[in-house]
Amino acid sequence: RIDADNLVSRHVSIFGMSGSGKTVMVRRIMDELLKKKYPMLVLDIHGDYLGFIQKQKKLYPKNEVKLFYPNLSVSSEDKEIIYTLIDKLGNSLTDPQKDFLSSLLEKVKYEGGSLLKYIELLVRRAREFAKDPTKFSKSVRPASMYVVVRSLGQVVKKLKNMEQTNFRHRQKMSKLKFEELPDAATEPEKIINKGQLSILYLKGYENLPASAIVSILLENLFKHRQEVEEEIPPFLTIIEEAHNFIPSRSEDKDNLPSVETIRKVITEGRKFGTGVMIISQRPSRLDETIASQCNSQIVFRMVNQKDQRATTRDSETLSVDDSKQLPNLANGQGIISGQVVNFSLPVQIKFDADLINDDIGNENFITAVENWDDKESVKQRKKFAKDFSNITSIDRRRANW
């Protein structure tokens, strides 16, 4: 029997190779927590948890299951994250050009809203300054300003491409109701509420933008839990493919904004009722500080020796002898250790067909190729382009500067 309170308050890690059973285990835990009406936020990259909203009426009639797509809402307070995004996604800039970008972010204030709209505003203001540099600074050459304008344009293009990719994947699941992610700074209760499961569908977003979205989201939710008023109840954040958000320093991705945010949440979270569950097939690639804060581990089949060593390094109760058994485990077999149990226990998880999204399922690639139709594929791409164009034109008409 797993101690539910220790699971949601003292953090847990779930590791295993692809197909070993870790995601099935996560869904089973979520199923039990939903019955207790415990609030959860899931960062879902591949759509592994969309079955919850599809089966909600049948399995969870007393719960709210919300399915969100990303909306990177920012304000001038997020200028460090914005600068990192522009610097990494845009063209390579010289030091004077980077100085101009930093000064531009300081000068162009933004009360809050879409990152894309803010960058488009930066483009307009940068062009104005380039036409009349005296409005900005005599020390910055117009040529440098135009280089920054082009770099900002590249960022806009990349972000729009990611939006389109995410939209294309959502179109394949037209039966599901997707909502734009509310602003966690002003409407946290729409994301975290008693009995509510919130799933953020991140498919199509590259590591850095996804990291920025997660960082701003969790930072704002954590602030609300720190406040005396407690606008939102305690909740559990489930981070799928965690190595994308909290990579180790050896991965040379320590500049991802989500690393510092999750590090803060996982080290201080217990005091404020914000638990974290991290899931990964590569524990050796995770930030050691964050992984070591997980007081319980559930480990499935694992053959990579680096990953085996990482599981024993981060666990106080998983022994070296236990880790030697990991390569021999069958799919669905694992070991539970830490504060959720009195002593290390073997576990056998059965496949949860009732929680699989029918539109995704376990795809058979041979069947997919046999049923492939080039004409239908072209038709679908044209339909997508038209639908996305209609949505973006509506957004442009709504824009209010």
Label each PLM-derived region with a short phrase.
Residues 36-41, 194-197, 232-236, 272-277:
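Loop/turn-to-beta-strand initiation segments
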Residues 332-401:
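Conserved P-loop NTPase motor module
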Residues 167, 171-235, 249-254, 261:
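Conserved helicase/translocase P-loop NTPase motor core
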Residues 61-179:
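Helical/strand "switch-coupling" subdomains that flank nucleotide/phosphate-binding cores, especially
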Residues 45, 234, 240-241, 248-249:
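Walker B catalytic acidic pair
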Residues 1-69, 288, 336, 366-370, ...:
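Glycine-rich phosphate-binding loop of nucleotide-binding enzymes
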Residues 18, 206, 283:
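The conserved Walker
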Residues 88, 263-350:
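Conserved ATP-driven motor cores of ASCE-family P-loop NTPases powering translocation/secretion/packaging/pilus
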